[in-house]
Amino acid sequence: MKIDDIKDLKIEYRDKLDINPKTTIGMEIEFQNAKLKQVNKKLKRNLDTNWIAKYDATVCRSILGIMHGGEINSPILRNSEKTWEDLQIVCNILTKNKAEITEKCGGHIHIGKQLLNEDSYMNFIKLWYIYEPIIYRFSYGEFNRERESIFSYAASVRNIFRVLIMHEYNYKNSFDIVQYLSSRRKLGVNFQNIYSKETIEFRCPNSSLDPVIWQNNVNFFAHLLDKANNVEIDEEKIQYLLRCHTDKHKNVADYTKIDLNNANELANIVFDNEIDKLYFLRQYIKNGEEKRSIDFTKSKKFTK
């Protein structure tokens, strides 16, 4: 598939996703500029579920004594029509209250750990190790590059995963792997919540006010975990990457480069549905721009 084949495709919002029915979901929507108290008031008035806006030091600031910005935490969600209707309402509330997504704002997604079998953690780690540059570029959503805060709050895990893979014989079960990974939280994928909240947290996505982006992100990460249970890992590719690995591979700033071959490869591993594949690739390529811009700017709109 070429960029020209999908550059005019628009990603549509769906009533429900075709994901494992065991999937549980959590979202953390960081935003700036909207009045925090006002957003919370609107959430309580318009929703019968427990979406809460709270203070977050990364994005909040006081203007004339009024707190602006914050983070909206969802309740534990399922893949239902109501979940996606509620997400639309939340995004509309933020938009109407003049919220903005800046390069300080992350859009973290929690997926219940039950999707990943106990003996599949190393499979997941290998998949992420191979395709991290693809995953990061996809997770930038409608923005052309990573947010500024990603280096501090959602750093690359490629070097950490490399050590695990090289010493795989020492990490035979999920407990050993989680013990090794749980010392740090502020990574692109965070295992620290595995036992306390029973979730795997994906911290690399930029935040968004577009529910289509959120839904597409959830769809990818849920499928990624689910597919790690039965994927056949390309061990030759792993060994090649281990041999060629240098410090530049941990530089997230280089992940704006488009690698359509690897993106296609990942889409074919993760998705069985052609629409899912196309929507993943469309968000990955954005407007086809590879040069990392100085400004944190949006791509030409590719959602309906």
Placement of each model-derived feature along the sequence:
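Terminal catalytic/cofactor-binding subdomain
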Residues: 1-97
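Aromatic/basic-lined ligand-recognition segments
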Residues: 24-28, 119-208
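A common structural junction motif
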Residues: 46-52, 94-101, 132-135, 222-232
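Helical (often loop-to-helix) elements that flank the catalytic cores of nucleotide-handling enzymes
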Residues: 80-90, 114-140, 210-225, 289, ...
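Flexible helix-coil linker/hinge segments at domain or subdomain boundaries
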Residues: 100, 133-148, 227-283, 288-290
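Histidine-centered divalent-metal-coordination microenvironment in nucleic-acid enzymes
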Residues: 100-116, 199-203
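Long, repeat-rich segments with strong aromatic
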Residues: 195-200, 204-233
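Acidic, glycine-enriched catalytic cores built around paired aspartates
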Residues: 283-304
